[in-house]
Amino acid sequence: MTRLAAAFVAIAGVLASPAGAQTYPNKPIRLVVGFTPGGSNDVSARLLASKLSPLLGRSVVVDNRPGAGGHVGANLVAKATPDGYTLFFTTAGVICVNPHFKPDMPFHPINDFEFVAFMSDYASVMATHPKLAVTDLRGFVAAAKAAPGKYNAATAGLGATQHIAFIVMNHLLDLKMELINYPGTAQATAAIVKGEVAVGIAAVSTMKSFIDAGSLVPLAVLRDKRSAVLPAVPTIVEAGFPEFLKNGSWGGRQFVLAPRGTPREIVAKLNGAIQQAMQDPDMKLKLRDLGQEDISGAAPEKVREIVKREYDTWGEVIRRYDIKAQQ
């Protein structure tokens, strides 16, 4: 293609994008989730999709594409046509954490996406099986130290936030826990409930029903303030391990991405629709029940800035502890 022809194509794209945004959407939108059904990300994505559909006038359909710590779904979206009809619902763990373990990934976690909008942030809780006969984090740490290599921990995959959390915990507290990686949070949590593994971390909403039923014992919320969903569970600071919070954000900031090159007008339209969806009274109630906090107010440029900063911070943590994906 000559330079002149390329220039005409570029100009045509710029001129066409406002018209495309005016008619967008005119067919169903696919919202890809990089984990299996039933986990906290899937639940949140389906809730958002149910509110976006009437606002946009088209169906928003969740498409679960689990694998590689969320990167199967991420790669699918990164390579999709940038027309606003394939979006990625994800968390900081997928974009900011595990890319540091995979320098040969077929996509770049920051440069290959348009950052559409934040949705919410949620707290995570660490829990164990009742058969361990411990009731708090201090008790679990003491038991793990007394029997090096005996206790294992469930994660949602190599490079997932839980994976990093337990590696950091092993380093900070001189533990020898083996990490068992599962395809997603739902499978990891099920393994803890069955007693196949000793301990795990998941969103408070994922753990709550099992904790209420006595199937799991909560050890600590991984924040500096208690969760409204599990108000009786102490924070990790109250449990006596404040240094843990200096090494990363262990919750689950959730956001929506689009393929790089998606027209700005479409990104802006989606951002506005997501912010509007988050103001729905039913949405607010369900988010509260899920232990999530609305953080949707940021413009796309601000979303990119915050996520890039968190990406850099996680890189520093991973280098500091010389963390390897195979650990």
Regions picked out by a protein language model, each given a short descriptive name:
Residues 3-16:
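Bacterial N-terminal signal peptides
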Residues 23-26, 117-121, 145, 246-251, ...:
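Short, flexible turn/loop "capping" segments at secondary-structure junctions
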Residues 93-104, 167-172, 199-235, 315:
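A ligand-binding cleft/hinge motif common to bilobed small-molecule-binding domains
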